[in-house]
Amino acid sequence: MDKITYAYLETTNYCNLDCSFCNRTDVIGSLKHMSLEDWGKLLDGIKHHPIEEAKLMGMGEPMLHPQFDEVCRMFKETFPKCKLIVATNCQYNVNDKFRECMKYIDMLYFSIDGYKESYERDRSPAKWKKLIKFLDQFKSVDRYNCDVVVNYVVNAYNVDDIEKIDTLRKENNLSQLRLNIAQIWDENKSLQDDIATSGYTTEQLDYLKNTWGDNIMGKSKWNYNDCFWVNNAIYTTVEGHVKMCCMNTGAEPFGNLFENSIDEIRQMTDYQNVKKGCQTNKPTSHCKNCSYKELIPILEYVGV
């Protein structure tokens, strides 16, 4: 069996925002913070895998977990050599818990999609003033060598704001601007169903290619048999459910880590069918609207 080297682990599904490209309200169950006891059990269940990179995020704002500093500490205690990545929406005040988290996080994404009006539109009910306050507070935070970057989800309505956010990044001594072309995380919908994810003009695409090509994440040379999720990754929800990837958060889980081992779940028939479908470039219905596959023409155009 292939070893897991990448983990995407959700420890809370609480969130203070309702972002336009997030299907959170359609897929989450009851609001929940994972207990430290369950978190310890989950880590024990996957610690035999050589995980090299992990993201502690999902359908919630990670920093809303009341013990997220302990969550991070426990993870790094279990996987001391693993690169730990966390994304945050910056819509809260920096506190001691946040400062403690910085000791364990290797890369921190500040999610900033758009400038002022477009930011508040796409990340409602986020407030621009609250973001600026957070950035001001962050200036006094010890980063402990954490690489702090800006993660920007690009859509057809915020392309013109990229330069403004890059200026904001520089003003706040953040190391990188990461541009992610917006995706749809729903297996029943396509990028073509939303003008914001498909309605780019040629001028916009040329601008992205010529000005920001080096900042755009992803790769255009990709087919289903290149999918690393089915071979070397794990995606878990706050309940312990195992799903295939973060591109299809609405899918039925293959199993639960608190009921079966991760190795047992990965051997189950439904899991293996999805895996074999990708490996043979004959995807099952699970992957029929893979938003990453749908992105390929755009990524090719912008030269990624």
What are these regions (language model features)?
Residues 1-21, 51-57, 231-240:
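N-terminal pre-triad scaffold of radical SAM enzymes
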Residues 14-17, 24-27, 36-114:
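Conserved SAM/AdoMet-binding glycine-rich loop
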Residues 16-24, 244-247, 284-294:
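Local cysteine-cluster metal-coordination motifs and their immediate loop/turn environment
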Residues 2, 280-281:
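Short loop/turn hinge sites at secondary-structure boundaries
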Residues 60, 153, 293:
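Short donor-sugar binding/catalytic loops of nucleotide-sugar-dependent glycosyltransferases
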Residues 10, 29-34, 44, 69, ...:
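Radical SAM enzyme [4Fe-4S]-AdoMet core and its adjacent flexible, acidic
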Residues 1-2, 290-304:
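Membrane-proximal basic amphipathic "stem/tether" segments
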